[in-house]
Amino acid sequence: MTREEKSIAIGDLTEKLAGTNILYVADISGLNAETTSNLRRACFKAGIKLEVVKNTLLVKAMEASDKDFGDLPLTLKGNTSIFFADVANGPAKIIKDFRKKSDKPLLKGAFINDEIYIGDNLLDSLVNLKSRDEVIGEIIGLLQSPAKRVIAALLNNAESKGEVAE
């Protein structure tokens, strides 16, 4: 790769990093072609972009980015693949699903909404993260619950008064 190609690749990666709040870094080395293809297919179906990158280029892109990736660049050793997603737990679910059949991919770390998660031991925690839509749904449910009770009590009270008047 020439210097010009490297600078273009760093620029592209920097743009992608700026455009996402959810980034997973994993090691998919050792997966055969069929399994890698299945992983890519599963990512595509889930709306996740999977790319294999050079560590040095990714480190430079992280340094050039406005975001603080903390110690995440320190995890970039060996083969590295990055998952770009819109749902916080999407890549974790795919990684966990693939780990049922194989010991790979290994999670190196994740950057989720300015929070850094480092280590494969956090995979279960990341799987259990709620998506934005799930959190909004829970909040709406919590807000609606007291209002429904008040309305039900008022209707119940009105019905009981109506029966007495008759």
Swiss-Prot record:
Classification via CDD domains: Ribosomal_L10
A Gene Ontology molecular function term of the record: large ribosomal subunit rRNA binding
UniProt cross-references to NCBIfam families, sorted A to Z: PRK00099.1-1
Complex and partners: Part of the ribosomal stalk of the 50S ribosomal subunit. The N-terminus interacts with L11 and the large rRNA to form the base of the stalk. The C-terminus forms an elongated spine to which L12 dimers bind in a sequential fashion forming a multimeric L10(L12)X complex.
Name this polypeptide is given: Large ribosomal subunit protein uL10
Keywords for the protein's UniProt record, in alphabetical order: Ribonucleoprotein, Ribosomal protein, RNA-binding, rRNA-binding
Family: Belongs to the universal ribosomal protein uL10 family.
GO cellular component: ribonucleoprotein complex; ribosome
Gene that produces this protein: rplJ
Task of the protein: Forms part of the ribosomal stalk, playing a central role in the interaction of the ribosome with GTP-bound translation factors.
Keyword Transferase: no
Entries under InterPro entries matching the protein: Ribosomal_uL10, Ribosomal_uL10-like_sf, Ribosomal_uL10_bac, Ribosomal_uL10_bac_type
One record GO biological process: translation
